[in-house]
Regions:
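Structural signature of outer-membrane beta-barrel domains
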Residues: 28-34, 83-89, 127-133, 181-187, ...
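Extracytoplasmic loops and strand-loop junctions of Gram-negative outer membrane beta-barrel proteins
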Residues: 43-49, 90, 141-148, 195-200
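Gram-negative (and chloroplast) outer-membrane scaffold detector with strong preference
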Residues: 63-144, 148-161, 166-172, 218
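Short, charged, low-hydrophobicity "junction" segments
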Residues: 7, 98-104, 193-195
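Short glycine/proline- and aromatic-enriched beta-strand/turn motifs that initiate or cap beta-hairpins
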Residues: 18-78, 217-226
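Aromatic-acidic/polar surface patches that form glycan- and anion
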Residues: 53-57, 96-98, 151-153, 205-210
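Sec-dependent N-terminal signal peptides
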Residues: 3-14
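Predominantly the C-terminal beta-signal and adjacent terminal strand-loop region
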Residues: 36-38, 163-226
Length: 226
């Protein structure tokens, strides 16, 4: 929580140096082989459940970005993002929910060249990642080894985003975008225990994640993107 508050304060401070402010919302798809295997093992080891536990693959993402003032085509900035995924399975006397949260603090390399490709831009985002995985059973926090079942993680992410500016009015833009991301390493040692009540059966303490996003960004700039 302290890290999140510190990141928010840093982001607010950085806004005083911003040339462009961006906020976006998107659909997010995630592929995590080890977490998928843990959920598949959960389903396989419980043949009595009629509704199988869905994989953690569909989610939403929201982010804020400040792009610093610069006359160069390649600009720099700060990005904060939050992602949420949910897996829910309702069975008789057993409603099982997995809630997965991600919080990223990243540094952006923002590039646009209106002389060659007017309206197009690309972002390279390098981020520190924190995660939290929680489980509820029948609307109550699930307990494992007499403790509330939860798993926290930390790692790093590299993302590439491409978008196109659409002018709404003077210095205000909307842009559709696509993003591809890769988290090569996220350390979350208790994730398997949260999902399947086992440790080391189908996954290690670390995990790799691939993501894709499709969404819209709202931009407010101090100068026109001409």
């Amino acid at each position: 929580m302290r890290a999140v508050l510190s990141s928010m304060l840093f982001f607010i401070f950085s806004s005083t140096m911003a040339q462009e402010f961006k906020t976006d919302v998107s659909y997010k798809y995630m592929f995590s082989n080890k977490w998928d295997k843990a959920i598949q093992t959960y389903n396989f080891s419980r043949p009595f459940i009629e509704t199988k536990q869905p994989l953690l693959i569909h989610g939403i993402n929201a982010s804020l970005s400040n792009i610093f003032k610069s006359s160069k085509r390649l600009k720099h900035g700060i990005n904060l993002s939050y992602s949420y995924f949910k897996s829910s399975a309702e069975n008789q006397n057993l409603n099982n929910n997995l809630n997965l949260h991600f919080f990223n603090l990243g540094y952006i390399f923002h590039y646009k060249n209106n002389e060659k490709a007017k309206g197009l831009y690309t972002d390279l985002i390098i981020s520190a990642v924190s995660s939290g995985l929680f489980r509820n059973v029948n609307d109550e926090p699930f307990e494992y080894d007499d403790k509330k079942s939860k798993a926290f993680g930390i790692g790093g992410d590299l993302s590439i985003r491409a978008g196109y500016y659409l002018n709404l009015k003077n210095k205000i833009y909307l842009s559709p975008f696509v993003l591809v991301g890769y988290t090569p390493y996220i350390y979350s040692p208790n994730s398997e225990a949260v999902i399947n009540q086992t440790k080391g059966l189908v996954s290690n303490d670390w995990n790799g994640i691939f993501t894709t996003q499709v969404g819209f960004t709202f931009h407010v700039t101090q100068q026109k993107n001409d």
